[in-house]
Amino acid sequence: MFFHGTSRVNGKGHLEIGGVDTVELANLYGTPLFVYDVALIRERAKDFKQAFADEGVQAQVAYASKAFSCIAMFQLAEELGLSLDVVSGGELYTAQQAGVSMERIHFHGNNKSRAEIEMAVEAGIGCFVVDNFYELDLLADICEQKRATANILLRITPGVEAHTHDYISTGQEDSKFGFDLVSGQATLAVKKALAVDSIHLLGVHSHIGSQIFETTGFVMAVEKIFEHLVTWREDHGFEPSVLNLGGGFGIRYIEGDTPRPVGDYVKEMIRAVKQQIAEHEMSMPEIWIEPGRSLVGDAGTTLYTIGSRKEIPNVRHYLSVDGGMSDNLRPALYQAEYEGALANRVNEQPVGMFSVAGKCCESGDMLIWDLPLPEANHEDILAVFCTGAYGYSMANNYNRIPRPPVVFVEDGDAQLVIQRERYEDLVRLDMPLVKKVKV
């Protein structure tokens, strides 16, 4: 069994995270329950920042907040000196409520609405990552109306395919995101952006995908980007002050996953950039990256209570838990795989393979297939590891199931940062049927 961060087995044979007994957490807050190891998040943030310091380059590390968003998480990111990557008005509003410095906000998204752009311009955010011509024109119009200026990066698709799931690949030419380099879209976008007085083009952004273990794709993306940067300098006098290379750094979910230390990704990126800078006699831009999963993914653990069991002789043994695709959509959406253990009996040896089923009314609601476990009983607490990214963020109310609470743990203390939804919350926005009165 592989433990992440501060996770360990305590004297009671229980899983402990951040110095807190997870069985006690389950008893106190109920299940399902998300538990975040804050010390591990701090360590990862420090590793990314130190990696850039070791390379001697100016950099911004922006937390990709779609991985997990809430007021407390945004406040922690600010405390750690991270910028914040948001992709919606809702995430921007959460950042405002958290008291985050707006100058550290980078606003992404392939279809920002007029209302969202106006909200961001009025808030004075640090940078828009412009995804398409529609947005470029809309932003220019809004800035003109409000007599404001906006810093932007142009998101480009470098034509690099990361070795990952199709749904989380974004750097190839056939993608809903960004300006294509090959067709000339990106060149036209640079020309248009430079012609607008209210827009300040800082540089370009590239993101090739997610859950990436190799550095080759990042290096190839840098090389392709600089091929065009050289041309843009010659033809348009544009040289970037910022180069954003995105995120996508992989983590270990299951045995066989082989992520690199974060310093390896940074080192290879910077090496590639410095090589291009020297070759083309350009100035070194500030480097931005956007880790999300790699900051919070393996810091999160979900606790469930085991309920019903079903055994099909010589076929499969099912264990059903009190959560499922309503709190972790990734197995159904991406065929994502996870590891787990009985939090209340961690040291006991497995007796067989069990498949963990969620409680939603869907045959595809399976959290884990073939998990080695001891003989599991009703009311045992199952811990599923590495659920810190895209678990709560994708949580939903399918089957009218309330979303779970979230607890931060550190140095023996636990803090509730998101309350459990109640049934009352599920109908709070509902309106009753109005019956027409017959005359």
Swiss-Prot record:
Name listed for the protein in its UniProt record: Diaminopimelate decarboxylase
Catalytic activity: meso-2,6-diaminopimelate + H(+) = L-lysine + CO2
Residues that bind substrate: R293, R330, Y334, E362, Y390
Class of this enzyme: lyase
Species of provenance: Halalkalibacterium halodurans (strain ATCC BAA-125 / DSM 18197 / FERM 7344 / JCM 9153 / C-125) (Bacillus halodurans)
Entry cofactors: pyridoxal 5'-phosphate
Superkingdom, natural source: Bacteria
Family: Belongs to the Orn/Lys/Arg decarboxylase class-II family. LysA subfamily.
Keyword Endoplasmic reticulum attributed: no
